[in-house]
């Protein structure tokens, strides 16, 4: 069993009614980076994860969490 990172970026973004581009602009990355994060193809750096927390106004552990993968 391995451990991965689960994220709620898409859920939180759509809850705000934002496009991927709007979120990308807010956190300072490309739309493609947001797409990759939402599809679990890219794990953001700690700095970027903290930026998501600030933009969403949510604790980091409500955006990103560890999950066991089989």
Question: What residue ranges belong to the model's regions?
Answer:
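Short basic helix-loop element that most often maps to the first helix and adjoining turn
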Residues: 7-26
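Recognition helix of helix-turn-helix/homeodomain-like DNA-binding domains
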Residues: 28-42
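DNA major-groove recognition helix of helix-turn-helix/homeodomain DNA-binding modules
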Residues: 47-62
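A detector for short, charged/polar N-terminal pre-domain segments
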Residues: 1-4
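Conserved hydrophobic/aromatic packing and binding residues within compact polymer-binding modules
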Residues: 9, 23-24, 34-37, 63
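Short, conserved catalytic or interaction motifs in soluble domains
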Residues: 39, 58, 68
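Short amphipathic recognition helices of helix-turn-helix/homeodomain-type DNA-binding modules
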Residues: 62-70
């Amino acid at each position: 069993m391995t451990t991965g990172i689960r994220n709620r970026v898409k859920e939180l973004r759509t809850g705000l009614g934002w496009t991927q581009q709007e979120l990308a602009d807010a956190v300072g990355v490309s739309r493609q980076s947001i797409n990759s994060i939402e599809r679990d193809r890219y794990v953001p750096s700690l700095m970027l994860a903290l930026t998501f927390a600030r933009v969403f106004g949510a604790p980091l552990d409500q955006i990103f969490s560890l999950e066991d993968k089989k």
